[in-house]
């Protein structure tokens, strides 16, 4: 969820906020200032990022209802999960989003709010048909992911199958070399792999790019967890990957126990792994 990196047809868009940008209204000065801040937050270090998104959340919440607030909350809703914003900030964003949707239903924004509710565990008081449909779609996606198996090769040619990893805790991470939030979380994945591999953690990082693109990227950065290639996007489709990064944790019994629809910090990954009994 998120300012995730989305891929449509043959064109790469490095932000799911772009659909809102295409219909962005002319902003008054206050809204222009908020819009400018949104354009800067991806470049901030984590500690500054957390403070900035908390401040922006309160500013957006206080805006009067109208097209400007609708556009800004749409953009912000797709950025605020790109790190550890904290539950209070996420709750403010969700409440502002629900207020906007009461006035002006929007299928895309309802989908964003549903993902906030499901995967960031915020409380949402909204009962529009579109929001209920978005939650139902997430339920269907999760059922499909739980039933999914796959076999893919890593960069050395070794094949990995999900069903053969029972007894291990498996963290599947969908990513790409061109995706900034994906690149930002990779050092944390490496640290987790080194720390918990002896305890049975397997990390499978899956890219839809060709091996000729992925291999030099990984070699240069010296990541050692398994990196798999899915250039036909078959496994991406099985997991309903509409934006990256996305991460899924399966426990030792093969049950899907945690999901993330955007970039996670090391602390957030640790919380996901605890749900599979790894700590």
Which residues does each PLM region occupy?
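Bacterial N-terminal signal peptides that target proteins for export
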Residues: 1-10
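A short beta-strand-turn-helix
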Residues: 151-170, 196
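Conserved redox-active cysteine motifs that mediate thiol-disulfide chemistry
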Residues: 166, 174-191
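Alpha-helical, heptad-rich or low-complexity scaffold/stalk segments
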Residues: 27-112
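N-proximal helix/coil linker or "cap" segments that precede and/or mark the start of modular domains
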Residues: 106-149, 163-166
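Structural microenvironment flanking redox-active thiols in thiol-disulfide oxidoreductases
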Residues: 183-221, 231-238
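Thiol/disulfide oxidoreductase modules built on the thioredoxin-like
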Residues: 216-224, 229-276
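Short pre-active-site segment immediately N-terminal to redox-active cysteine/selenocysteine motifs
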Residues: 168-170, 174-178, 210, 243, ...
């Amino acid at each position: 969820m998120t300012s995730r990196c989305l891929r449509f047809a043959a064109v790469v868009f490095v932000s799911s906020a772009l659909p809102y940008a295409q219909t962005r209204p002319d902003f008054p000065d206050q809204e222009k200032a908020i819009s400018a801040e949104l354009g800067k937050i991806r470049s901030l270090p984590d500690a500054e990022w957390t403070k900035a998104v908390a401040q922006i959340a309160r500013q957006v919440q206080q805006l009067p209802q109208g097209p400007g607030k609708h556009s800004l909350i749409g953009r912000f809703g797709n950025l605020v999960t790109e790190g550890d914003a904290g539950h209070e900030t996420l709750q403010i964003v969700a409440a502002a989003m629900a207020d906007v949707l009461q006035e002006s239903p929007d299928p895309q924004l309802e989908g964003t709010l549903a993902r906030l509710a499901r995967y960031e565990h915020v409380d949402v008081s909204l009962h529009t048909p579109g929001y209920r449909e978005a939650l139902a779609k997430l339920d269907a996606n999760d059922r499909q992911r739980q039933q999914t198996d796959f076999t893919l090769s890593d960069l050395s040619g070794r094949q990995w199958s999900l069903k053969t990893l029972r007894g291990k805790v498996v963290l599947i991470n969908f990513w790409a070399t061109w995706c900034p939030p994906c690149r930002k979380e990779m050092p944390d994945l490496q640290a987790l792999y080194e720390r918990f591999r002896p305890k049975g953690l397997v990390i499978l990082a899956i890219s839809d790019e060709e091996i000729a693109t992925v291999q030099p990227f990984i070699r240069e950065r010296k990541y050692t967890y398994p990196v798999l290639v899915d250039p036909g996007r078959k496994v991406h489709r099985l997991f309903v990957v509409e934006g990256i990064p996305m991460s899924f944790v399966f426990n030792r019994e093969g049950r899907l126990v945690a999901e993330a629809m955007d970039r996670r910090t090391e602390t957030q990954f640790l919380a996901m792994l605890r749900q599979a009994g790894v700590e």
